[in-house]
Protein backbone atom coordinates (compact mmCIF):
# COMPACT_ATOMS: atom_id res chain seq x y z
CA UNK A 1 0.00 0.00 0.00
CA UNK A 2 2.83 2.42 0.75
CA UNK A 3 4.31 1.92 -2.68
CA UNK A 4 3.88 5.38 -4.19
CA UNK A 5 5.11 6.02 -7.71
CA UNK A 6 7.89 8.57 -7.90
CA UNK A 7 8.34 11.01 -10.76
CA UNK A 8 12.11 11.25 -10.39
CA UNK A 9 12.07 14.45 -8.32
CA UNK A 10 13.15 12.66 -5.12
CA UNK A 11 10.41 14.62 -3.35
CA UNK A 12 9.58 12.92 -0.08
CA UNK A 13 5.88 13.08 0.69
CA UNK A 14 5.36 10.29 3.22
CA UNK A 15 5.72 11.23 6.90
CA UNK A 16 7.24 7.87 7.80
CA UNK A 17 10.02 8.25 5.20
CA UNK A 18 11.15 11.73 6.23
CA UNK A 19 14.13 12.58 8.42
CA UNK A 20 14.00 15.05 11.31
CA UNK A 21 15.83 17.81 9.41
CA UNK A 22 13.40 17.41 6.49
CA UNK A 23 10.48 18.12 8.84
CA UNK A 24 12.26 21.18 10.19
CA UNK A 25 12.86 22.45 6.65
CA UNK A 26 9.24 21.80 5.62
CA UNK A 27 7.91 23.78 8.61
CA UNK A 28 9.50 26.96 7.22
CA UNK A 29 7.10 26.77 4.25
CA UNK A 30 3.80 26.29 6.14
CA UNK A 31 3.10 22.76 4.92
CA UNK A 32 -0.17 20.90 4.86
CA UNK A 33 -0.36 17.47 6.45
CA UNK A 34 -2.95 15.10 5.01
CA UNK A 35 -4.17 12.26 7.22
CA UNK A 36 -5.80 9.47 5.18
CA UNK A 37 -8.37 7.63 7.24
CA UNK A 38 -10.60 4.72 6.40
CA UNK A 39 -11.29 1.21 7.58
CA UNK A 40 -10.52 -2.41 6.95
CA UNK A 41 -13.85 -4.09 6.36
CA UNK A 42 -15.73 -6.43 4.09
CA UNK A 43 -16.99 -5.06 0.80
CA UNK A 44 -18.66 -8.16 -0.52
CA UNK A 45 -17.07 -10.57 -2.99
CA UNK A 46 -15.80 -7.88 -5.37
CA UNK A 47 -13.41 -5.65 -3.34
CA UNK A 48 -10.48 -6.20 -0.99
CA UNK A 49 -10.70 -5.32 2.70
CA UNK A 50 -8.48 -2.22 2.34
CA UNK A 51 -10.50 -0.34 -0.29
CA UNK A 52 -11.63 2.34 2.22
CA UNK A 53 -8.06 3.21 3.21
CA UNK A 54 -6.24 2.50 -0.04
CA UNK A 55 -8.24 5.09 -2.00
CA UNK A 56 -7.70 8.07 0.36
CA UNK A 57 -4.04 7.14 0.85
CA UNK A 58 -3.29 7.09 -2.87
CA UNK A 59 -5.36 10.23 -3.44
CA UNK A 60 -3.43 12.07 -0.72
CA UNK A 61 -0.11 10.85 -2.11
CA UNK A 62 -1.01 12.03 -5.60
CA UNK A 63 -2.01 15.48 -4.32
CA UNK A 64 1.24 15.71 -2.36
CA UNK A 65 3.25 14.66 -5.39
CA UNK A 66 1.63 17.24 -7.68
CA UNK A 67 1.59 20.32 -5.41
CA UNK A 68 4.78 22.35 -5.68
CA UNK A 69 3.74 25.69 -4.12
CA UNK A 70 4.29 24.43 -0.57
CA UNK A 71 5.09 21.10 1.07
CA UNK A 72 2.31 18.56 1.41
CA UNK A 73 3.11 15.66 3.71
CA UNK A 74 1.01 12.50 3.89
CA UNK A 75 0.73 11.19 7.45
CA UNK A 76 0.64 7.45 8.08
CA UNK A 77 -2.87 6.23 7.28
CA UNK A 78 -5.39 5.53 10.01
CA UNK A 79 -6.59 2.16 8.80
CA UNK A 80 -8.82 1.29 11.75
CA UNK A 81 -12.23 2.89 11.55
CA UNK A 82 -15.69 2.86 13.08
CA UNK A 83 -17.47 0.04 11.30
CA UNK A 84 -19.32 -1.84 14.02
CA UNK A 85 -22.20 -2.64 11.66
CA UNK A 86 -19.94 -4.89 9.58
CA UNK A 87 -18.58 -6.95 12.47
CA UNK A 88 -20.78 -9.87 11.44
CA UNK A 89 -18.68 -10.27 8.29
CA UNK A 90 -15.30 -11.98 8.14
CA UNK A 91 -12.31 -9.67 7.76
CA UNK A 92 -13.80 -6.57 9.36
CA UNK A 93 -11.78 -4.74 12.02
CA UNK A 94 -13.62 -2.03 13.96
CA UNK A 95 -12.79 0.38 16.74
CA UNK A 96 -15.29 1.58 19.31
CA UNK A 97 -16.58 5.08 18.53
CA UNK A 98 -14.77 6.66 21.49
CA UNK A 99 -11.52 4.87 20.63
CA UNK A 100 -11.65 6.01 17.01
CA UNK A 101 -12.38 9.62 17.95
CA UNK A 102 -9.62 9.63 20.59
CA UNK A 103 -7.18 8.18 18.04
CA UNK A 104 -7.96 10.88 15.45
CA UNK A 105 -7.79 13.64 18.08
CA UNK A 106 -4.46 12.36 19.45
CA UNK A 107 -2.94 12.12 15.98
CA UNK A 108 -4.01 15.69 15.17
CA UNK A 109 -2.68 16.95 18.52
CA UNK A 110 0.62 15.19 17.92
CA UNK A 111 0.98 16.60 14.41
CA UNK A 112 0.16 20.09 15.74
CA UNK A 113 2.70 19.66 18.56
CA UNK A 114 5.31 19.08 15.86
CA UNK A 115 4.59 22.59 14.58
CA UNK A 116 2.17 21.82 11.76
CA UNK A 117 -0.88 24.09 11.70
CA UNK A 118 -2.66 22.99 8.52
CA UNK A 119 -4.08 19.48 8.84
CA UNK A 120 -6.57 17.85 6.49
CA UNK A 121 -8.21 14.46 7.02
CA UNK A 122 -9.15 12.61 3.85
CA UNK A 123 -11.77 10.03 4.73
CA UNK A 124 -12.48 6.92 2.70
CA UNK A 125 -15.11 5.29 4.92
CA UNK A 126 -18.65 6.60 5.30
CA UNK A 127 -18.91 5.41 8.90
CA UNK A 128 -16.01 7.69 9.88
CA UNK A 129 -17.54 10.90 8.51
CA UNK A 130 -19.67 11.96 11.50
CA UNK A 131 -17.09 10.89 14.12
CA UNK A 132 -14.34 12.83 12.28
CA UNK A 133 -16.59 15.87 11.99
CA UNK A 134 -17.27 15.74 15.73
CA UNK A 135 -13.53 15.60 16.46
CA UNK A 136 -12.89 18.59 14.18
CA UNK A 137 -15.25 20.72 16.28
CA UNK A 138 -13.22 20.15 19.46
Language model regions located:
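Short helix-capping segments at alpha-helix termini
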Residues: 65-71
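Structural motif
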Residues: 31-33, 71-73, 120
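Short, conserved active-site loops that position catalytic residues or coordinate cofactors/metal ions
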Residues: 35-43, 76-78, 82-85
Amino acid sequence: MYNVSHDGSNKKILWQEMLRHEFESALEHKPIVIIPDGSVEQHGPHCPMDVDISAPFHMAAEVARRVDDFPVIVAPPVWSGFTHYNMGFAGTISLQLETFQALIADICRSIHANGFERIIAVNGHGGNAAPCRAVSWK
